[in-house]
Amino acid sequence: MRVELSRTFRFEAAHRLPMVPAEHKCHRLHGHSFAIDVSVEGELDERMGWLVDYADITSVVEPMLLQELDHRNLNDVPGLENPTSERLSEWLWRRLAPHLPGLASITVHETCAARCTYRGL
C-alpha cells in the first residue's frame, strides 16, 4: 500500500524581499511564524504498519531548522538572499532530500493563508 505522510514544524524568522519595489510592504524587514510541512511517500511497512517513524523525520528536520533558520534574518542565510516562500521551499528540499528517503514535498506556510509547495528538483 502506497501512502504519504506529513509532519509540521514551526520556526520564527525575519526577512525582507529585496527584489520587490521599495514601496512594497515586503521590501521592509518583517517577521513570520513559519510552518513547514515535510511530506514523505512510499510503501507501507506491513509489519510495522507505518511508512516511517515520525521521530525519524523530526530528528532530521528539527536540528536544521533550529540551528540555521529559527530566530534568524533569512536574508543572512547563504542561499536565501531573496527569501521568498518559493526559494525557501527549494532551499529546504535541497538540504533535506539527501537525508529523507521518499521526500515528496515541502510546504512553506508564511501566514495562515499564504503557502508554497515544492515537489522536488
Spans of model-derived segments:
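Charge-rich, low-complexity N-terminal segments
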Residues: M1-L121
